[in-house]
């Protein structure tokens, strides 16, 4: 069989693990621990702190121009630590997905996975990367074209960054590099949930295909059909284990994602309407606004899609030729039927379901923040 036609979920995560290697968290290369310590200390922790301190006693207009990015950096660091804490579980999920890859039986299943979940997951990965690169470029250009010798964002330094040209450019470079690395961290944070939801949805659909075919091949004996059903039960158990691990992995990180998106969408809208000082700044805020929606929408969409695929499992069970099966098969079928009746959903913080209703609720929350801010406008 052509290896390119095989179902290989691990290939969809190569870019994801590349982000962690670039950040010094994963991989085996010289000075990895030094890279990890440097980025964690001076970027993940100190960069948001220097942004927060930089807003102290500054004019309101300057605070608003930097507030969206300060908030995003703060939540980015929070999500980064949440995901880093759960990397062991993420690797376990990937191992279970590889086990499910090996269960693919027919050309129909391979074609479906490669043309649907695999293609969509690659598109999502590329979309996040394009959005990140666009944000880095527009932020840097907007900073370079701002009037006067100003930094990209309000920030505190233990010296006068305007003292000399060299000191200014060192400070500017720190913000440019720091913001770029935090955007790289955000790629690792935000790309994982929708890609995994998409891959899991694909494997649920493949299980549906396998279950619905049982009993329709006259060449197979009753014992062979029963074995296929038991294998389907084992596949379902692995899928439910993945769901349990995803609940643990995304419990806190996605709650931060919802809060971050709601707050930053509203702040960015205000900046676009009232505080953008030139076309480059307007473009940057517009790209940032789009990035906020891109961060949130795929997770919610593929979260509800995954739930809908699980809801189809009972119908797949009764699509098999169960009426002509023996008692052993039907007993196993009843067991699987009871297992598939368990609701499958993942909630951020155990409160907010990761689905489209949560996406629209977040957008409504952002609009509420926006109207509240307008009411304080003089």
Swiss-Prot record:
Record's GO cellular component terms: dendrite membrane; membrane; plasma membrane
Chief site of localization: membrane
Source taxon at top rank: Eukaryota
Localization, UniProt: Cell membrane
Keyword Amino-acid biosynthesis attached: no
Pfam families: 7tm_6
Keyword line: Cell membrane, Membrane, Olfaction, Receptor, Sensory transduction, Transducer, Transmembrane, Transmembrane helix
Transmembrane segments: 34-54, 63-83, 128-148, 164-184, 255-275, 286-306, 356-376
Note: The atypical heteromeric and topological design of the odorant receptors appears to be an insect-specific solution for odor recognition, making the OR/Orco complex an attractive target for the development of highly selective insect repellents to disrupt olfactory-mediated host-seeking behaviors of insect disease vectors. Odor-evoked OR currents are independent of known G-protein-coupled second messenger pathways.
Protein's name in the database: Odorant receptor 33a
Gene assigned in the entry: Or33a
